[in-house]
């Protein structure tokens, strides 16, 4: 199976702070891998380096075998990401938002892509509304459409369902499940949501203090640690003071 994403001995330091410490993992084509860890453990920094937005102190990120630092422009055209911390331009309509982002990525079949995503994400009736008037759930679906406008082969998700109501969160998770199967993309999902991780991810990376402290399928991790569920495994690992330090 092709390794669409390969992170090799990746580290990031800020003066005396080690934000990410020598992490290594792979994500195959048609696979969603979960990145689970407490606030401040290095998840967002890791995603920033994978996107080429942050320069690693050491290590490499390979996308389809190519180094992101050396091939940033060409690789970013086939990558995208979602974060709840990035706001949409409030005065643009949904359609205008998608057109702007589509042109940034030089999408050739832009109108067809907008039609496809607006149908899949239930945005058809919202295309001519300004985003400043949308609910948080509607904005989330627009952000998802924006992240998929360039038909990426690699998708990085940072808390994609944060602050969503249960119904909208379930819709987004179902969409991601189906989209991954249809497009055979590689996905890294950073989340605090255990149900989301268990439902979407074939394997999980447990992160603490900038390091990957354990990894495996949810069932493997539960069995290995003799716990009832993934949440208990997670709490055991992040509360450990000495075992992994």
Which residues does each predicted region cover?
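Conserved ABC ATPase "signature" region
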Residues: 99, 103-126
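Conserved ABC ATPase signature
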Residues: 130-134
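Conserved catalytic motifs of ABC-family nucleotide-binding domains
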Residues: 151
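Catalytic Walker B motif of ABC-type/P-loop ATPase nucleotide-binding domains
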Residues: 155-158
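Helical segment within the ABC ATPase nucleotide-binding domain
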Residues: 170-182
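ABC ATPase "signature
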Residues: 215-216
């Amino acid at each position: 199976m092709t390794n669409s994403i390969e992170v090799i001995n990746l580290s990031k330091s800020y003066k005396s702070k080690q934000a990410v410490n020598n992490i290594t993992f792979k994500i195959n084509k048609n696979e969603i891998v979960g990145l689970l860890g407490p606030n401040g453990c290095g998840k967002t920094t890791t995603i920033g380096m994978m996107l080429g937005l942050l320069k690693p102190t050491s290590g490499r990120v390979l996308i389809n075998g190519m180094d992101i630092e050396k091939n940033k422009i060409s690789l970013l055209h086939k990558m995208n990401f979602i974060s709840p911390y990035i706001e949409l331009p409030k005065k643009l309509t949904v359609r205008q938002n998608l057109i702007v982002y589509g042109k940034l990525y030089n999408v050739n079949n832009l109108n067809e892509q907008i039609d496809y995503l607006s149908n899949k994400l239930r945005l058809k009736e919202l295309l001519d509304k300004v985003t400043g008037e949308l609910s948080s759930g509607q904005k989330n679906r627009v952000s998802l459409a924006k992240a998929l406008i360039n038909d990426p082969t690699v998708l990085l998700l940072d808390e994609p369902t944060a602050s969503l109501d249960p119904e909208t969160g379930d819709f987004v998770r179902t969409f991601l499940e189906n989209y991954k199967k249809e497009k055979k993309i590689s996905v890294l999902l950073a989340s605090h949501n255990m149900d989301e991780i268990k439902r979407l991810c074939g394997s999980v990376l447990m992160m603490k203090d900038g390091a990957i402290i354990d990894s495996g399928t949810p069932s493997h991790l539960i069995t290995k640690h003799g716990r009832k569920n993934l949440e208990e495994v997670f709490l055991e690992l992040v509360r450990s003071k000495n075992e992994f330090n």
